[in-house]
Regions:
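Rossmann-fold NAD(P)-dependent oxidoreductase module
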Residues: 22, 26, 141, 188
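C-terminal helical subdomain
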Residues: 198, 217-291
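Active-site loop of short-chain dehydrogenase/reductase
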Residues: 8, 66-67, 94-96, 146-160, ...
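Catalytic loop of short-chain dehydrogenase/reductase
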Residues: 105-109, 117-123, 127, 153-191, ...
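A short, exposed helix-loop element centered on a Lys and neighboring polar residues
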Residues: 139-140, 183
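A glycine/serine/threonine-rich, flexible loop-to-helix segment
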Residues: 49-50, 114, 191, 203-230, ...
């Protein structure tokens, strides 16, 4: 699959690491001008306490001839999000083709293995602001640029495309709410020519996941000894290529309002993961659930 997004403009909110970083890279490598946003900048890491920064993401894009603009932005703060889109409007003549809402920041706020009434209420509520309200704020300021031109795509990144319980009330609420954001935005944007979808990866080998297993991407299969399910995992670039395929699809409106998966879109559009494979977490998970 080769998509040409030359001349398009994208904002990837939450592009510091993981899926957001890969999405920004794939969009930039396909020719889009990409605004790479997040909290972590060189010399000032976010509360995630990870080494990745938005400048690093931008450098990955420009190293391959792409155009990337790193903008520090806390997407829970409306005035900062407004300033971001004011800048996009001024620098890109009001153009915005793709908005990816991938802000999360909920890992330090998630407490697994406890019922919700024993989970920190403060952390649970903060998670909703970090992972849900940040998306609302970002779309509220960004979508008008698309509506004005009668064209655009909003991608709401989530975890899981079904109504199945996700292991913790607060985590489940955040991820399910993001799907509903896509559904609701799609309904209100449809008359204006703008599409909105939710999109999930499978078991994704993010930087943090690789660190957890004590492996690098080059030897990731060593992690299968600790967790056999890791064999069905995928890189962040797999779901990123799904975003590029959607952005390049002139008939993407038919997908508006849907919750999509990396593996289903790989079959439809024909893209692969970086190693040429097409991981299918959905089928794998169904098989182990039925066994």
């Amino acid at each position: 699959m080769h998509a040409d997004l030359s001349g398009t403009v994208a904002v990837v909110a939450g592009a510091t690491r993981g899926a957001g970083r890969a999405i920004a890279c794939e969009l930039g490598w396909a020719g889009a001008t990409v605004y790479v946003t997040g909290r972590s900048v060189r010399g000032a890491p976010s509360p995630m306490q990870r080494p990745e920064t938005i400048e690093d993401t931008a450098d990955l894009i420009t190293a391959r001839g792409g155009r990337a603009i790193a903008v520090q932005c806390d997407h829970t703060e409306p005035e900062k999000v407004k300033a971001l889109f004011d800048r996009v409007r001024a620098e890109q003549d009001g153009r915005l083709d793709v908005l990816v809402n991938d802000v999360w920041g909920g890992d330090p706020l998630s407490h697994w293995g406890v019922p919700f009434w024993e989970h920190s209420l403060d952390d649970g509520l903060r998670m909703q602001r970090q992972a849900v309200w940040s998306h609302v704020i970002t779309s509220w300021y960004g979508v008008p640029l698309m509506v004005e031109r009668g064209h655009g795509l909003v991608v709401e990144m989530t975890d899981g495309a079904t109504a199945d319980y996700r292991g913790s009330l607060f985590y489940d609420l955040a991820k399910a709410s993001v799907i509903r954001l896509a559904v609701a935005q799609a309904a209100e944007l449809r008359p204006h020519g703008v599409a909105a979808v939710a999109l999930t990866p499978g078991f994704m080998r993010s930087e943090a996941v690789l660190d957890h297993f004590g492996v690098a991407e080059s030897n990731w299969r060593d992690g299968v000894a600790e967790d056999p399910h890791f064999a069905a995992s995928e890189t962040p670039f797999y779901v990123a290529r799904a975003v590029v395929a959607l952005a390049a699809d002139p008939d993407v409106a038919r997908r508006s309002g849907q919750a999509l998966t990396s593996w289903d879109l790989a079959r439809e559009y024909g893209f692969t993961d970086v190693d040429g494979s097409q991981p299918d977490w959905g089928t794998y998970f169904q098989q182990i659930s039925n066994s």
